[in-house]
Swiss-Prot record:
Its EC number is 3.1.1.96. The keyword Metal-binding does not apply. GO terms for molecular function: D-tyrosyl-tRNA(Tyr) deacylase activity; Gly-tRNA(Ala) deacylase activity; Ser(Gly)-tRNA(Ala) hydrolase activity; tRNA binding. This is D-aminoacyl-tRNA deacylase. It is found in: Cytoplasm. A Gly-cisPro motif from one monomer fits into the active site of the other monomer to allow specific chiral rejection of L-amino acids. Its main location: cytoplasm. The gene is dtd. A motif (Gly-cisPro motif, important for rejection of L-amino acids) lies at residues 137-138. Pfam families: Tyr_Deacylase (PF02580).
Length: 145
């Protein structure tokens, strides 16, 4: 499982011009699920993200978590995070989990975040989406589990 975590001032995801999810201050999560991932990875990722201190306090130190700042999450499934680029010029996605299992696990991940008291908006699994965001920092972390 790979999650790209971006601290944002605001973010939105649109499908065919219609906004399906949007947040103000918070985290944009790009979520890639690999073959072999399961509940263990989903729970660990949700715990880590819920507790991660990546927002600045009054002193400018990254001491605050998303709940501390009243932030929201926009979760977007993105299988291309599992691209293998070692050979040739065309990325291979053989390590990415296939639907419908990947869709189910992404939904479980989002529910784990909600269980931890977080507000979660989402894109739509498998859709052609346009993601708009304003990075804060920029502050980006890649979480591999």
């Amino acid at each position: 499982m790979r999650v790209v975590i971006q601290r944002v001032n605001h973010a939105a995801v649109r499908i065919d011009g219609e906004t399906v999810g949007q947040i103000q201050k918070g985290l944009l999560l790009l979520v890639g699920l690999a073959e072999g991932d399961g509940e263990e990875q989903v729970v660990k990722a949700a715990d880590k993200i819920a507790k991660m201190r990546i927002f600045e306090d009054e002193a400018g130190k990254t001491n605050l978590g998303i709940k501390d700042v009243g932030g929201q999450i926009l979760s977007v499934s993105q299988f291309t995070l599992l691209a293998d680029t070692k050979r040739g010029n065309r990325p291979s996605f053989v390590h990415a989990m296939r639907p419908p299992k990947s869709s189910q696990l992404w939904e479980e991940f989002n529910q784990e975040l909600v269980k931890r008291g977080l507000t979660v908006e989402t894109g739509e699994f498998g859709a052609d989406m346009k993601v708009e965001l304003e990075n804060d920092g920029p502050f980006t972390i890649v979480l591999d589990l």
